[in-house]
Regions:
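Active-site acidic/histidine clusters and adjacent loop/turn architecture
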Residues: 98
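Acidic, serine/threonine-rich low-complexity disordered tracts
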Residues: 6-95, 110-207
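C-terminal motif of bacterial Sec signal peptides marking the signal peptidase cleavage site
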Residues: 2-4
Length: 207
């Protein structure tokens, strides 16, 4: 069981992560094996190209970041669906760090559209970049994973990096426990737009 001081939303995320990390894989995607082992599988599209499947490789016990790795070595480090670092992409992110609160930690609870969040980004585009983000609710949509279709809250992230004159809307689909199941993200202009789905997702069953 993951320890530490966690919010209610983050505890749900941590419980889900615990279930996934029990099977730590770096293998070719196998639907039967995924279902039998409860393995973490991320379905990813980069720049609108075909889907690739990335296996859950490891969990950082200090930050609770999940590292998903593809067969060709591309890595996405994520905290509750939010990209925190990448490896072996055309342009990589070294780190994304929250500076004033973190809606992904809080499980998207009590978000106000007027509240601004700040993120420090370290990447090849520049050191010490700061992104500004606001979040607004955009309704409920049905998202399909390997285990079924689920009604999820759609949140739009208005993301901007003033130093690069860059603005974009990123999208997150979140379950009732605050877990990000699907996202569309492009943190910086020299990165490809990433469409990410936690393909192995199924709702956490509470006792």
């Amino acid at each position: 069981m993951l320890g530490g001081c966690l919010s209610t939303g983050t505890q749900s995320v941590a419980n889900s992560v615990s279930q996934l990390v029990r099977s730590n894989i770096e293998i070719d995607y196998d639907d039967t094996k995924m279902r039998a082992a409860g393995a973490g599988v991320l379905q990813a599209q980069f720049g609108g190209r075909g889907s690739v499947y990335m296996g859950l490789h490891s969990l950082n016990l200090q930050t609770y970041d999940l590292l998903f790795v593809s067969n060709d070595g591309v890595g996405l480090e994520m905290y509750n669906g939010h990209i925190r670092a990448t490896t072996k992409l055309v342009a990589d992110i070294r780190s994304v760090t929250p500076l004033s609160g973190d809606p992904f930690f809080d499980g998207f609870l009590e978000l106000h559209p007027a509240k601004t969040y700040f993120w420090k980004i370290q990447s090849a585009s520049g050191y010490g970049l700061v992104a500004h983000a606001r979040y607004r609710f955009s309704g409920t949509e049905q998202i399909k994973t390997a285990y079924g279709s689920w009604d999820l809250a759609h949140w739009v992230e208005s993301w901007s990096v003033e130093e690069l004159d860059y603005q974009v809307d990123n999208h997150y689909w979140v379950d009732k426990q605050g877990i990000v199941v699907k996202s569309i993200q492009q943190p910086l202009p020299d990165h490809e737009r990433m469409d990410l789905l936690l393909y192995s997702y199924k709702p956490v069953v509470t006792q």
